[in-house]
UniProtKB/Swiss-Prot annotation:
Lineage: Eukaryota, Viridiplantae, Streptophyta, Embryophyta, Tracheophyta
UniProt cross-references to InterPro entries, sorted A to Z: NAC-dom (IPR003441), NAC_dom_sf (IPR036093)
Region (Disordered): 304-333
Protein name from the UniProt record: NAC domain-containing protein 4
Tissue spec: Expressed in roots, tiller buds, stems, leaves, lamina joints and the young husks. Expressed in embryos, coleoptiles, radicles, leaf pulvinus, ligules, panicles, palea and lemma, anthers, and the internode of the peduncles. Expressed in young leaves, root meristems, florescence meristems and young spikelets.
GO biological process: abscisic acid-activated signaling pathway; auxin-activated signaling pathway; ethylene-activated signaling pathway; gibberellic acid mediated signaling pathway; regulation of DNA-templated transcription
Cellular component, GO annotation: nucleus
Length: 343
């Protein structure tokens, strides 16, 4: 009792924590408790772990924020047996893994057993985050502490153990991509900066670009890479549509038409030329039809030479304005283009 009072009167400097090693717990605390049951330590309380639930132990401890230490007498499951009772009112402690040897100067002095608390009853108990390290004496130190130095052996039924109890998190980490996304999300939520390489990698892996062209109505031929690689950003619907010989064949159904042959030849010679530019240079759909009917090659210069003759026609409804800008009659041009594709 005097020893406990002397320890209680110690004034430790701020910042000191009770964080002993396994060997220190055995030799400086448990061995003294086994040798003398009246021994009391400043940082280690006494508790019956079979009558206390793990979540109640922090309030019974003398000190500790994340780890709590207790002296405990082993509770025998049967009066005449040596099996330890590990059950509480809400669950039970289950041993896991192998016992660890604890040495002092190459001499075996104790053993450490790891136990996990399960709620409910075995074998259908639910695992919790509460973990306990149970320390017991072993070897010559055990024999000495059990009372051989006092001339009488102690009963193994009253065996003292020292327990360290703490709680672990049961949150499982996901896949590698989930970790990176969680880290980036947390950093963004805190307003912090993240690595650009990690952010770019996640962005590139999560974004799926849509196809540039609809291949459902295309013919058997392959699509020209020069055509598919071009991405337009025009606000006008007509400006973004470029000539595609494969698509023309797919809609036309064959190569027998001289108009389609001329169009195919033009598409092979002038990649990247929009339909609007073609229509304007030839004064619309009528100019294209006349050029195809006459067997001439579809050259922009030739189409420009026929501008005055074709502008006099009232069937097309197009003006002879040389201004390349699209006028307010864009709806009519869209109708001509629809007729062109359905030719």
């Amino acid at each position: 009792m005097e020893q406990h009072q002397g320890q209680a009167g110690m004034d430790l400097p701020p910042g000191f924590r009770f964080h002993p090693t396994d060997e220190e717990l055995i030799t400086h605390y448990l061995a003294k408790k086994v040798a003398d049951a009246r021994f009391a330590a400043l940082a280690v309380a006494e508790a019956d772990l079979n009558k206390c639930e793990p979540w109640d132990l922090p309030s019974l401890a003398k000190m500790g924020e994340k780890e709590w230490y207790f002296f405990c007498l082993k509770d025998r499951k049967y009066p005449t047996g040596l099996r330890t009772n590990r059950a509480t009112e809400s669950g039970y402690w289950k041993a896991t893994g192998k016992d660890k040897d604890i040495f002092r100067r190459k001499a075996l002095v104790g053993m450490k057993k790891t136990l996990v608390f399960y709620t409910g009853r075995a074998p259908k108990g639910e695992k919790s985050g509460w973990v306990m390290h149970e320390y017991r004496l072993h070897g010559k130190l055990h024999a000495a502490a059990l009372g051989f130095l006092h001339g009488k052996p102690a009963s193994s039924k009253n065996e003292w153990v020292l327990c360290r109890v703490f709680k672990k998190s049961l949150v499982e980490v996901g896949a590698a991509g989930g970790k990176k996304a969680a880290v980036v999300t947390m950093e963004m939520a805190r307003g912090g900066s993240t690595s650009s390489s990690v952010a770019d990698e996640i962005a590139m892996s999560s974004v799926v670009l849509p196809p540039l062209m609809d291949m459902s109505g295309a013919g058997a031929g392959a699509v020209d890479p020069a055509t598919t690689a071009h991405v337009t950003c025009f606000s006008n619907a007509l400006e973004g549509q470029f000539f595609n010989p494969t698509a023309v064949h797919g809609h036309g159904g064959g190569d027998s038409s001289p108009f389609m042959a001329s169009f195919t030849q033009y598409g092979q010679l002038h990649h990247g030329v929009s339909l609007v530019q073609l229509l304007e240079s030839c004064n619309g759909y009528g100019g294209l039809v006349d050029m195809a009917a006459s067997g001439s090659q579809l050259q922009p210069a030739a189409c420009g030479g026929e501008r005055e003759r074709l502008s006099a026609s009232q069937d097309t409804g197009l003006t002879s304005d040389v201004n390349p800008e699209i006028s307010s009659s864009s709806g009519q041009k869209f109708d001509h283009e629809a007729a062109l594709w359905g030719y």
